[in-house]
Amino acid sequence: MTRLRESSTYTARPEPDEAVLSGPAETSSRASASLRTLGAVAVLVVGAVHLDEYLADHFNVVPVIGPLFALNFAGATLIGLGLLVPAARLRLLHLLLALGGIGLAVTSFAFLFISEHQPLFGFQDYGYRMEIVVALGAEAVAVVALVAYLATRARRRA
């Protein structure tokens, strides 16, 4: 008697994706951390643009606007660096810093918009120089990223 062997080709089992292995909670945590980091970098860019305007474009001699540019840089630096600290125990601080980053970006955008159309504290800006375009882009990215970060946090808690 001959024995018939069943012929089969062995194929290696595909490796599951990291996202499948880690589950939705870890994926959400990664997305949250990525959004927080993106928002932090955008806030730091907003501050850097204001520092550049303060020092290089001589906004430091404009009476009220100059000190506001310096304060914007200082606030953006504190907020951005605080958001980059990756400690799980700082969740409440990250929440407050994200709200602060959104507030800083929205306020910067609003003050620029006002100063383009009428004098603000005795100063009126004009045109869209490269610095203004970079600041507007960074402010938009900061708001979108930090709002999305807060939304992922809220969804994870629910």
Cite the ranges covered by each PLM segment.
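Membrane-interface extramembranous regions
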Residues: T2-A158
